[in-house]
Amino acid sequence: MITLRKLPIALAVAAGVLSTQAMAVDFHGYARSGIGWTASGGEQQCFQTTGAQSKYRLGNECETYAELKLGQELWKEGDKSFYLDTNVAYSVSQRDDWESTDPAFREANVQGKNLIESLPGSTIWAGKRFYQRHDVHMIDFYYWDISGPGAGLETIDLGFGKLSVAATRNSESGGSSAWIDNQRENAKYTINNVYDVRLAGLETNPGGSLELGVDYGRADTQEGYSLAPNASKDGVMLTAEHTQSLMGGFNKFVVQYATDSMTSYNTGHSQGTSVNNNGHLLRVIDHGAINLAEKWDMMYVALYQDIDLDNNNGNTWYSVGVRPMYKWTPIMSTLLEAGYDNVKSQHTGERNGQYKLTLAQQWQAGDSIWSRPAIRVFATYANWDEKWGYSDTTGVAQDGTIGTNSRGKNNEVTFGAQFEAWW
């Protein structure tokens, strides 16, 4: 029993322990928000080529978005540890003061490091997780991303490289059916499992390394349920990525090939219940960020992606862009982003094209093109000519703007201010 005399001491010790634990909580995240206008009137418009899977993002983001991550090392003994990581994401239209939205629970996982004596340096994990994602920042395009609920063992040291294995899951609405009480009933959802194997850190040349990956995705129906007869069911995605240190930064060269269920989402997620994604995908990307001179940095990307589908509803996407940055002082810079997208329809043979230019004056926490937080004012000009779009009723590509999501031919100017931060 704690006497009254000892109570203040006990409370002080407890407060100290709780304070230490509170200080150990890691707070990380990403956020962006701002305000913008369109020269012809109204709120800021954003510009993305019909058929392209992303857009050049500088001065071309029309939403408030945030990811708030809380994590803590829950236990540590020597080099062994358990770490809890969570992430809640929000996205709203940034039109009003009060904008309510349901948050997306993106991550909740525990990672155990060095728990397997025979595999020093490895990490075992389970839960929802952003898993080893690969992206092109300037177009916000995640080309290798199997994130979701899952489990795995990563960074197994083989001597010549690091091996990682994982299984993750996502679902499709409906997708399968069964005879129940003498009638056909559709499932509310059908899950897709992805099995991922990666070998990273393969030294190829001075300053260069190679990462190889295989992803197999398959629809997994409930007992008694079956997919449509012509559903893609499963597919494979192969990835090879070479990373080279270059001019104070890096260059990444990526080649990916995918089949059937792995073609429609084409970042690593599977859609095996679909009847419209049998075919194959080939993607080649070269992107990076370099230091050109004492006061100059630059991001760049060149992308080719061909989705050849059996139903003739695929497309071929070309994209090229640069974002040079001139640093007036260690905390103030000017950026120019120039990007061009062109998408050819497999069905119609027609093309959609757009070029987009953004000039931004920026104040950032440091003199790197990656320095954040940043506050920027910007002006954007976009010019597009679209010959085809996807039908509003069937989803099949067709010529013209009537009854499709084609934007036709036009141009526009927008301007505004935005902050962006990661921490």
Swiss-Prot record:
Entry annotated with the keyword Transmembrane: yes
Catalytic activity, as annotated: beta-maltose(in) = beta-maltose(out)
Primary localisation category: membrane
Site (Important in sugar transport): Y142
Compartments, record wording: Cell outer membrane
CDD domains: Maltoporin-like
Site (Greasy slide, important in sugar transport): Y30, Y65, W98, F250, W370, W422
Signal peptide: 1-24
Gene Ontology MF terms in the entry: carbohydrate transmembrane transporter activity; maltodextrin transmembrane transporter activity; maltose transporting porin activity; porin activity
One GO CC term, this protein: pore complex
Membrane topology reported for the UniProt record: Multi-pass membrane protein
Keyword Transport (UniProt): yes
Pfam families: LamB (PF02264)
PANTHER family in the record: CRYPTIC OUTER MEMBRANE PORIN BGLH-RELATED
Entry's family note: Belongs to the porin LamB (TC 1.B.3) family.
Function: Involved in the transport of maltose and maltodextrins.
Complex formation: Homotrimer formed of three 18-stranded antiparallel beta-barrels, containing three independent channels.
Name of the protein in its database record: Maltoporin 1
Species the sequence originates in: Yersinia pestis
Designated gene of the protein: lamB1
